[in-house]
Amino acid sequence: MDLFFRKYGSGPPLIIVHGLYGSSDNWVTIGKALGRRFEVFIPDQRNHGRSQHSDHHSYELMRDDLLEFMDKHSIGKPILLGHSMGGKTIMFFATSFPERVNGLIVVDIAPKSYFSYSGESVQAADHLFIIRAMENLDLSKIRNRDEADREMSSRIKSGRVRQFLLKNLSRSKNGTFHWKLNIEVIRKDLVRILEGLNASEFERGNQITGFPVLFIRGANSTYILDSDIPFIQKIFPYAEVTTIPDAGHWLHAEQPEMLIEKVVRFVFGE
């Protein structure tokens, strides 16, 4: 699949992979800042941003999209940074093609599954709520983004989250709005998006040890709990886990300078 991407700077290659509902647009500020030290590539994943839509959405497909992207742009062995769904994408990639990875930076996501048939998963419930809120927005009646924001405010109270989601709105030539995000497929394949890696595949010496690994979590986020660290280290036994204070799941928007600092320190030891 041909992925739209943005590129900044020069230096060792770094690929930033965005999360669910996101796009390269959310990472421009961080991409430009990291471009002072890296050659930064930020692709839009399938069914997101300006990349192509597909009838299917899974980590195996996104992993293969990333491999195709790297081969197309002659990126041999980059550092991979992924947030949320993008973090899962790069974990699936790194465990499948470890020889193509120079370092792994996973932002606020664990390798576990976040799906629960019992309905106990806060994250699964949150995603279903967000998808329904987007689907219930009557775009035929929306004249501008402020109206869309007001309509969504009755369902989604956080202004920050609404603005993040509304970055997916695009105006057609006839003046009507549409979602850049392929909401129908995201809803259909949400269970697959919430799935995790199988830790049993990495027993008996199959763990990933050939490159440094950093997990960065937000102090106010519930995506990486202390109880998840043993699971992380079953797959990545030498992984470091660090926490950014005063940040939730979207820590790249809440604490961008701290995130940049941790990335630079991890790669260059500064």
Q: For each of these PLM feature ranges, what is it?
A:
Residues 32-35, 41-85, 89, 95, ...:
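Active-site loop/oxyanion-hole signature of alpha/beta-hydrolase fold enzymes
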Residues 13, 39, 74-79, 100-103, ...:
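Structural signature of beta-strand start/N-cap positions in the alpha/beta core
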Residues 238-270:
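Catalytic active-site module of serine/aspartate enzymes centered on a nucleophile-bearing elbow/loop
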Residues 44-49, 110, 247-248:
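Short beta-to-alpha linker loops that shape the active-site pocket of alpha/beta-hydrolase fold enzymes
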Residues 139-193:
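Conserved alpha/beta-hydrolase catalytic His-Asp/Glu region
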Residues 95, 102-145:
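Flexible "cap/lid" loop of the alpha/beta hydrolase fold
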Residues 173-235, 240-243:
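Conserved serine/cysteine hydrolase catalytic core
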